[in-house]
Each structure stands twice: as structure tokens, then as C-alpha cells.
Amino acid sequence: MDAMDLSQRPPRKPRAELGGIIFLPRSIDKARAHRPGGDPGPYVLRGFTQHMLDMLGITQEAFVEVVAVAASDDDVLTSILARTSPEQIATWNAWVSARQPRNGDRVAALESYPWLGERPDLQLGLDVLEEDDNRYFAART
């Protein structure tokens, strides 16, 4: 897959799914941005992406290589499904769907995302990441 520039726009939304795997499209975008010629902007492969890979039993190196040689998202999905089980996917999806920022420590979350004080309705990490994307790119325009 071609490199991607995430300095100009965010990766796909945190709740986006591919093949029933939450966060996979976003992680693909981040891996593409780390390819030669790409620009990851503020995005890294640790964090949720690393948790996803760990829970699916895939190394970061293997994932980056799969994305590099894939022609499409479906190619990445085929490779992921060959390396993981439905149980691992279900465990990941349940974990990420319930995950709170900074393990539920609101004070620590406020240190990372000071604007959370204005948004007490955002309790889940996926929602916080989406709002953080929105705020980051709104501030750049």
C-alpha cells in the first residue's frame, strides 16, 4: 500500500472496523504513514495499535510488513485473519470498546487531554481519540 500523510488529515476513525476488527483501519493508516515517503504527523504505532496487535498475536514488525506489501485493506485483513482467532478478535473488540483513557484515571487523562474538562460525556478511549483528532486538525486550519 502507498505511504500516507497524516500531517494533513487524521487516520480513519477509532471505531472504524474492517472484517469485524475495531480500530484495524486506523492502524493500517498509521502503518502506511510510517512507510518511506509517508508522514505520521502526531500518530504513533504504540498505544491502541500495539494493544490490538498484542491481543491478536501479531508483532508490530509483521503488521508493518503486511501493510507494506498489501495492495488493499482486504489483503491486510486476509493476512490478519490467517494469524489470529475469532476469540482473539472478540477479546480485542470487547477490551477496546470498554477502555477508558489512562485506565480510568480521569486526572491522568486530563493531563494528556486538558480539553476533557469541557467534555465529561467522553468516557471511552475511542471517543476521546476521535475528539482529539477533531481538535488537533481544527486548530491547524
Predicted regions and their residues:
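Charged interaction scaffolds used for protein-protein
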Residues: 71-90, 97
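Intrinsically disordered regions, especially transient/low-confidence alpha-helical propensity segments
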Residues: 89-92, 112
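Polar/charged low-complexity regulatory segments
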Residues: 2-40, 49, 96-141
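Alpha-helical interaction segments
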Residues: 13, 53, 81-85, 126
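Amphipathic alpha-helical packing elements
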Residues: 38-80
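Generic alpha-helix signal with a bias toward terminal, lower-confidence helices
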Residues: 57, 65-70, 75, 92, ...
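Short amphipathic alpha-helical segments that mediate assembly, nucleic-acid/protein binding
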Residues: 24, 60, 73, 77, ...
